[in-house]
From Swiss-Prot:
<feature type="domain" description="Carrier">
    <location>
        <begin position="1"/>
        <end position="79"/>
    </location>
</feature>
<dbReference type="GO" id="GO:0016020">
    <property type="term" value="C:membrane"/>
</dbReference>
<keyword id="KW-0597">Phosphoprotein</keyword>
<dbReference type="GO" id="GO:0000035">
    <property type="term" value="F:acyl binding"/>
</dbReference>
<comment type="function">
    <text>Carrier of the growing fatty acid chain in fatty acid biosynthesis.</text>
</comment>
<keyword id="KW-0963">Cytoplasm</keyword>
<dbReference type="InterPro" id="IPR006162">
    <property type="entry name" value="Ppantetheine_attach_site"/>
</dbReference>
<feature type="modified residue" description="O-(pantetheine 4'-phosphoryl)serine">
    <location>
        <position position="39"/>
    </location>
</feature>
<dbReference type="GO" id="GO:0009245">
    <property type="term" value="P:lipid A biosynthetic process"/>
</dbReference>
<keyword id="KW-0444">Lipid biosynthesis</keyword>
<dbReference type="GO" id="GO:0000036">
    <property type="term" value="F:acyl carrier activity"/>
</dbReference>
<keyword id="KW-0276">Fatty acid metabolism</keyword>
<dbReference type="InterPro" id="IPR009081">
    <property type="entry name" value="PP-bd_ACP"/>
</dbReference>
<dbReference type="GO" id="GO:0005829">
    <property type="term" value="C:cytosol"/>
</dbReference>
<dbReference type="InterPro" id="IPR003231">
    <property type="entry name" value="ACP"/>
</dbReference>
<dbReference type="InterPro" id="IPR036736">
    <property type="entry name" value="ACP-like_sf"/>
</dbReference>
<keyword id="KW-0275">Fatty acid biosynthesis</keyword>
Length: 80
């Protein structure tokens, strides 16, 4: 899976989970500051990403994922 494919899938999941237009979701979008996610939204988003990509995102790692790009980099590293 290429970085672009991961980005598209992450953007789609973020758009759906946070109820924002897909055009608003960019690689540098911050989940809380730009997309209005609260802490519960963030937990649900992490769970959705884990399920969609069949990976585990430890709590420590999840705390470091603040933007769409951060999520893509983490997933890319996990999927190797």
């Amino acid at each position: 899976m290429s970085q672009e494919e991961i980005l598209q899938k992450v953007c789609s999941i973020v758009s759906e989970q946070l109820s924002v237009e897909s055009g608003e979701v960019k690689s540098d979008s911050n989940f809380q500051n730009d997309l209005g996610a609260d802490s519960l939204d963030t937990v649900e988003l992490v769970m959705a990403l884990e399920e969609a990509f069949d990976i585990e995102i430890p709590d420590e790692a999840a705390e470091g994922i603040a933007t769409v790009g951060d999520a893509v980099k983490f997933i890319e590293a996990k999927k190797g």
